[in-house]
Amino acid sequence: VLLFLNVVLFCYIYFYDLPRIDERKTLEARRRVYGPEAATIDSLTRSNRTGETVKLEKRTDSWWLTAPYEWPADRNAVSGLTNTLQLLEHETSFAVAELAQSGRSLADYGLADPALTLQFTSAGKSYTTKIGDVTAVGNRLYILSPDGTRIHVVNRSLAESIGLPLDS
């Protein structure tokens, strides 16, 4: 009897649960703003509208603040920021190409002149994300994808990680 129950349980997991687990992983991956490039970040640059720039670079096993001055960076702070970028998921997103049809533009989302620009390099390639206005509800942000084709609505945890005041 126990052998029969084990076989039934195995069949249930194999035929019912495993496809659902794979489906959930696929959905999670689709909601991520960045792909695998966010796992191998070599440098980060944060610039605001006024031109203030903060740059972090990875040197061997440690991170260094290289602009506006040179200083060893706090490993935990940088780790928190890189983890936020790796796990950043959008609540929703829409194509930039659809904006003209609705009579809107990047400026309506604060992305024509973004409050903040976040640039990172990974494996020698540069990725730039523009961070725009806070949504009407106030707990989310508009960001423009690195390829410039999608606007993502993300949680404000991104702003908190990079030190952006939410009223900016």
Indicate residue ranges for each PLM-predicted region.
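Soluble, acidic/polar mature domains that operate outside membranes
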Residues: V1-S168
